[in-house]
């Protein structure tokens, strides 16, 4: 259902701190205020239960606003009325499980609306940090099945070194694992469906049969070289999302953030990887953008300017669909 809204101004979203056994109990200096009794592994920036922090809809969840005003948020070209992307920051103190996500077809077979293709942008990485993405050449599903039972699956994983600023694309069907040493901004289809293959002895459910069904031996996963343009760096531009990085001092207009193919304009998210900014425009109160916070820019947002208030490193994330 769409409400009677005709225009929505940019608004900041409060994060949701999600407990994970492999996470940290203290996220400083990245996040100062954490509401949890146990280790935090993920900070959801655009989860359905995240609450709007500014503007006339402050206090509502993101899911509630999408139910009320999906077309105003997404634009006329959107293929669905649901929130298209889940954006999060991942803090891994221990190795995550070796896992795989289903594609759209397989997810629907098991009663879910969509699968999960994702990407990781390294906000920070220690020397020697690594992630596992895909399987080594020659590995078969039988090999994977045997190694799951023997606890030796790691030896068949394709291991990538990761540095700050790297972008890793992980399409559905890719066996993968996040390891300690990096802090990752993840953009993904709005689905939290994971099939665990191997979990390092932790007492969590495994999904071996479904994970083998979901696994593709060859995928398009891997590091994506950045494309440097005059006013931005395109980190990735694939079927479900586009990530761009903007640096620079002074003011930047909302029009200058658009890419050439965004006609008509759709929903966008602005994430402050570092530094801070402020969004101002006619008809709405200024919206502050502190470090590691996110602002949603609805398709119908009025024109605005974003001011760099100090070392602003801006990541713009947009859902991709035919326009």
What residues fall within each predicted segment?
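Short, structured beta-strand/loop micro-motifs enriched in basic residues and often containing a Trp
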Residues: 146-153, 276-278
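Short beta-strand/loop turn elements enriched in aromatics
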Residues: 122-144, 233-235, 248-266, 277
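His/acidic/aromatic-lined binding-pocket segments of jelly-roll/cupin-type domains
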Residues: 87-89, 96, 118-121, 159-160, ...
């Amino acid at each position: 259902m769409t409400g009677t809204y005709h225009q929505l101004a940019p608004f900041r979203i409060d994060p949701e701190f999600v407990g994970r056994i492999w996470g940290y109990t203290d996220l400083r200096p990245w996040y100062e205020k954490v509401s949890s009794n146990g280790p935090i592994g993920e900070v959801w920036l655009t989860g359905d239960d995240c609450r709007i922090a500014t503007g006339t809809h402050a206090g509502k969840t993101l899911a509630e606003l999408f139910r009320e005003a999906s077309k105003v948020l997404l634009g006329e070209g959107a293929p669905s009325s649901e929130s298209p992307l889940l954006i999060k920051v991942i803090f891994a103190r221990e190795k995550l499980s070796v896992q795989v996500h289903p594609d759209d077809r397989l997810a629907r077979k098991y009663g879910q609306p969509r699968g999960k293709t994702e990407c990781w942008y390294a906000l920070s990485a220690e020397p020697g940090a690594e992630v596992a993405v895909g399987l080594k050449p020659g590995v078969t599903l039988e090999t994977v099945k045997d190694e799951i039972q023997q606890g030796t699956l790691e030896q068949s994983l394709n291991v990538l070194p990761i540095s700050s600023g790297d972008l890793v694309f992980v399409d559905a069907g890719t066996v993968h694992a996040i390891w300690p040493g990096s802090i990752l901004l993840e953009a993904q289809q709005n689905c939290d469906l994971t099939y665990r293959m191997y979990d390092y002895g932790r007492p969590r459910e495994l999904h071996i049969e479904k994970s083998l069904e979901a696994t593709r031996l060859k995928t398009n996963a891997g590091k994506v070289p950045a494309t440097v343009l005059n006013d931005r760096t395109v980190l990735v531009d694939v079927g479900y999302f586009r990530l761009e990085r903007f640096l620079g001092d002074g003011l930047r207009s909302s029009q200058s953030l658009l890419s050439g193919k965004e006609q008509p304009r759709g929903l966008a998210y602005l994430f402050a990887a570092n530094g801070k900014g402020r969004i101002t425009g006619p008809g709405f109160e200024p919206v502050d953008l502190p470090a590691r916070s996110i602002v949603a820019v609805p398709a119908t947002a009025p024109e605005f300017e974003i001011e760099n208030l100090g070392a602003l490193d801006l990541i713009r994330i947009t859902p991709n669909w035919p326009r």
